[in-house]
């Protein structure tokens, strides 16, 4: 089962209530926040409902490892370190990321890891309008494997 990275692009002004509730269920309360979700029909329906405020795509293990290492936070706003992951799970961050992508483990298996990654705005900008879909040259909606390039620019 693939994992999807979901990033909130647009703010909270004039958001309709059902979309606002969906974004809250996805834990995307602020712009440039990222969550990792499973590729299931229920999540895909939620993403489709909020498609005018978010972008998403399939994340790979290498990008997930960088995301955990650089932007992962533990309760108390402490960074996730190799030593912490080794102590709790007995593996490196890269091995953990690979197991998460393969579906053998979940991000919840790492104790005290916050479910939301707070990202920097993309270096070089969104390369298009924040109000148009990715297919139309904008930043919103499904972008497939290209989500990895966006996350790299936001780390």
UniProtKB/Swiss-Prot annotation:
Report any one BP term from Gene Ontology: translation
Q: State the InterPro entries in the record.
A: Ribo_uL30_ferredoxin-like_sf, Ribosomal_uL30, Ribosomal_uL30_arc, Ribosomal_uL30_CS, Ribosomal_uL30_euk_arc, Ribosomal_uL30_ferredoxin-like
Alphabetic keyword roster: Ribonucleoprotein, Ribosomal protein
Quote the Gene3D superfamilies the UniProt record gives.
1.10.15.30, Ribosomal protein L30, ferredoxin-like fold domain
Domain of life (superkingdom):
Archaea
- Indicate yes or no for the key word Endoplasmic reticulum: no
- Report if keyword Ribosomal protein is assigned: yes
The record's section on SUPFAM superfamilies has:
Ribosomal protein L30p/L7e
Disulfide pairs? none
One Gene Ontology term of the molecular function aspect: RNA binding
For this record, an example GO cellular component is: cytosolic large ribosomal subunit
HAMAP family, per the entry:
Ribosomal_uL30_A
- PANTHER family documented for this protein: 60S RIBOSOMAL PROTEIN L7, LARGE RIBOSOMAL SUBUNIT PROTEIN UL30
State the family it belongs to: Belongs to the universal ribosomal protein uL30 family.
**NCBIfam families annotated for this entry?**
PRK06049.1, uL30_arch
Please describe the quaternary structure of this protein.
Answer: Part of the 50S ribosomal subunit.
This chain belongs to which protein, by name?
Answer: Large ribosomal subunit protein uL30
Q: Which organism is it from?
A: Pyrococcus abyssi (strain GE5 / Orsay)
């Amino acid at each position: 089962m693939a994992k999807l990275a979901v990033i909130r692009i647009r703010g909270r002004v004039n958001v309709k209530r059902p979309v606002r509730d969906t974004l809250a269920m996805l834990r995307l309360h602020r712009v440039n926040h990222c969550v990792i979700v499973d590729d299931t029909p229920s999540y895909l329906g939620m993403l489709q409902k909020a498609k005018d405020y978010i972008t998403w795509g399939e994340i790979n293990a290498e990008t997930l490892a960088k995301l955990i290492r650089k932007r992962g936070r533990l309760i108390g706003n402490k960074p996730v370190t190799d030593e912490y992951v080794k102590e709790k799970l007995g593996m490196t961050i890269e091995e953990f990321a690979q197991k998460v992508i393969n579906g053998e483990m979940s991000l919840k298996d790492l104790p005290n890891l916050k479910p939301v990654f707070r990202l920097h705005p993309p270096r070089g900008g969104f390369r298009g309008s924040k109000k148009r879909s990715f297919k139309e040259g904008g930043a919103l909606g499904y972008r497939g494997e290209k989500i990895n390039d966006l996350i790299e620019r936001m780390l």
